[in-house]
């Protein structure tokens, strides 16, 4: 055994002793308050438990492995529909309390006292449909997290799912603690570990984890204005060459450095045309009222959502397909104490109940969507009667685009329409009082200002970014100016009412 392995083992043993001591201290009272480390636990539990369960895929008749099961807040709920639940916790008194609460009611639960980091924990490969973990990885060190995720992927059947929920950045509960060994990590740590995890079966097939969704727990946003409760749902899939549109966004168009350089141009918190200036102008048209609910489709890094929530006291749900965008948005939310939650989601597959939102807002995003009529029908369904939709988006002039513009559209994967046709699609979806404005003149003024500021502040830009980054921005903005000045690329503003 080499020196590094010995040191890792020693640190691992110390970590486990510290964590076990911590939870033995907080498990003297086997109550929901002690498990959630919060005096308001009962109220929070009523709100968040159904929210968490609603994120899960169907577990009817399935095998569910619950890691860190505690006294069974979720165990009984899972057992109502699952074929078999394996409930595991490393504190003996806690798992016994779980069995006392749920064992007589549900005969499909196996209760286990075990440490998830122990090599003695044996779960058969490809035997589990869903692994469920609510506040667990934050009590493991980084190496333990990586090793456990590697084991979980092997335990899962192909097509199986992992749900994890963690406290990120800082403590949420108000319980007094003598010591607190919890690892309050940035969400991107967990995302990176899951994205980089691979496993192989006996036939040599390679499997990876594909993100289904990631979001703030809404109950904590509503009750505490706290965005640090983050959950992820991953699916075990066979590795393929085609990584899909989400990977394209995160690895090509919206890499982390790309997002930051866009923000440098658009202004802090913004990655769409005009930044704060156009956001304020457009949002002011919505006549927002305190307590209303807004859906932001393609929320980016959250600047517009923070503005709406802080200025008008509305609740905003921001969704974006880019993991990188949402990661930045959640990080920027910390400490703001506003009612904004974020979720990685595909607006073309996401479902909401009818009459959920007062406003649907989208800035320069729907250009990515190929089937706009279907999306607009969903917008109409999701809005309350009298609700409004506001969209700004890239458009094009009527007729056939030039070869150069057509190549640009294809390379970006855009679906562009002329302003009139765009407005007609909203009318066809059922909307009334449709305003479809050609805002290309404003677009040109904004582009010229943004390009001018970038060139004027070249030295400061190059202190934080590369020459290639600078050239990409200058060339990209110059090309947009050329296409728009020639009348090919347009920018539209659309407002409509249900």
From Swiss-Prot:
EC numbers: 2.1.1.103
Keywords associated with the record: Methyltransferase, Transferase
Record GO terms (molecular function): N-methyltransferase activity; phosphoethanolamine N-methyltransferase activity
Pathway: Phospholipid metabolism; phosphatidylcholine biosynthesis; phosphocholine from phosphoethanolamine: step 1/1
Regulation: Inhibited by phosphatidic acid.
Keyword Signal found: no
Residues at which S-adenosyl-L-homocysteine binds: 68, 73, 89, 115-116, 134, 271-272, 298, 320, 346-347, 363
Any one biological process term the GO annotation gives: methylation
Residues bound to N-methylethanolamine phosphate: 253-254, 262, 394, 408, 412-414, 480
Highest taxon of the lineage: Eukaryota
InterPro entries in alphabetical order: Methyltranfer_dom, Methyltransf_25, Phosphoethanolamine_N-MeTrfase, SAM-dependent_MTases_sf
Induction: Induction by cold stress, salt stress and abscisic acid (ABA).
Effect of residue 298 to D: No effect on catalytic activity
Transmembrane domains' residue ranges: none
Catalytic activity: phosphoethanolamine + S-adenosyl-L-methionine = N-methylethanolamine phosphate + S-adenosyl-L-homocysteine + H(+); N-methylethanolamine phosphate + S-adenosyl-L-methionine = N,N-dimethylethanolamine phosphate + S-adenosyl-L-homocysteine + H(+); N,N-dimethylethanolamine phosphate + S-adenosyl-L-methionine = phosphocholine + S-adenosyl-L-homocysteine + H(+)
PANTHER family to which the protein is assigned, alphabetical: PHOSPHOETHANOLAMINE METHYLTRANSFERASE, PHOSPHOETHANOLAMINE N-METHYLTRANSFERASE 1
Role this protein plays: Involved in phosphocholine biosynthesis. Catalyzes the N-methylation of phosphoethanolamine, phosphomonomethylethanolamine and phosphodimethylethanolamine, the three methylation steps required to convert phosphoethanolamine to phosphocholine (PC).
Similarity comment: family membership: Belongs to the class I-like SAM-binding methyltransferase superfamily. PEAMT family.
Protein name: Phosphoethanolamine N-methyltransferase 1
């Amino acid at each position: 055994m080499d020196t590094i392995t010995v040191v890792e083992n020693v640190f691992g043993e110390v970590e486990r002793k510290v964590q076990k001591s911590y939870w033995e201290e907080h498990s003297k009272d086997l109550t929901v308050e002690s498990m959630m480390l919060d005096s308001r636990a009962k109220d929070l539990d009523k709100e968040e438990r159904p929210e968490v369960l609603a994120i899960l895929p169907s577990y009817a008749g399935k095998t569910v492995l619950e890691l860190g099961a505690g006294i069974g807040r979720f165990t009984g709920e899972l057992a109502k529909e699952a074929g078999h639940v394996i409930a595991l916790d490393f504190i003996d008194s806690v798992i016994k309390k779980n069995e006392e609460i749920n064992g007589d009611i549900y005969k499909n639960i196996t209760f286990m006292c075990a440490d998830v980091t122990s090599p003695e924990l044996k779960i058969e490969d490809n035997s589990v449909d869903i692994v469920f973990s609510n506040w667990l990885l934050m009590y493991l060190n980084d190496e333990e997290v990586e090793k456990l995720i590697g084991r979980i992927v092997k335990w899962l059947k192909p097509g199986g799912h992992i749900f994890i929920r963690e406290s990120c950045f800082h403590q949420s509960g108000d319980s007094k603690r003598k010591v607190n060994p919890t690892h309050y990590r940035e969400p991107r740590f967990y995302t990176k570990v899951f994205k980089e995890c691979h496993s192989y079966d006996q036939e040599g097939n390679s499997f990876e984890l594909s993100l289904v969704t990631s979001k703030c727990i809404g109950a904590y946003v509503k009750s505490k204005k706290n965005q640090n409760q983050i959950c992820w749902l991953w699916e075990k899939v066979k590795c393929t060459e085609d990584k899909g549109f989400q990977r394209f966004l995160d690895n090509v168009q919206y890499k982390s450095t790309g997002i930051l350089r866009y923000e440098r141009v658009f202004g802090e918190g913004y990655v769409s045309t005009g930044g704060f200036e156009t956001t304020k102008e457009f949002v002011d048209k919505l006549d927002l009222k305190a307590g209303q609910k807004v859906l932001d489709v393609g929320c980016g890094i959250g600047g517009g959502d923070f503005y709406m929530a802080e200025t008008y006291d509305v609740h905003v749900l921001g969704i974006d397909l880019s993991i990188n965008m949402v990661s930045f948005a959640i990080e920027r939310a910390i400490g703001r104490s506003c009612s904004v939650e974020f979720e990685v989601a595909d607006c073309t597959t996401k479902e909401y109940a009818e009459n959920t939102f007062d406003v649907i807002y989208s800035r320069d995003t729907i250009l990515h969507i190929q089937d706009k009529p279907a999306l607009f029908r969903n917008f109409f369904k999701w809005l309350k009667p009298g609700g409004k939709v506001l969209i700004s988006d890239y458009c094009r002039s009527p007729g056939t685009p030039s070869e150069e513009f057509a190549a640009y559209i294809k390379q970006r994967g855009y679906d562009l329409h002329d302003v009139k046709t765009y407005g007609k699609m909203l009318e066809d979806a059922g909307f009334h009082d449709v305003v479809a404005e050609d805002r290309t003149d404003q677009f040109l003024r904004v582009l010229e200002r943004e390009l001018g500021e970038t060139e004027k502040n070249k030295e400061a830009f190059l202190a934080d970014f590369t020459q290639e980054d600078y050239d990409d921005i200058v060339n990209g903005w110059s090309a947009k100016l050329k296409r728009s000045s020639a009348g090919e690329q347009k920018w539209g503003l659309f407002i409509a009412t249900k």
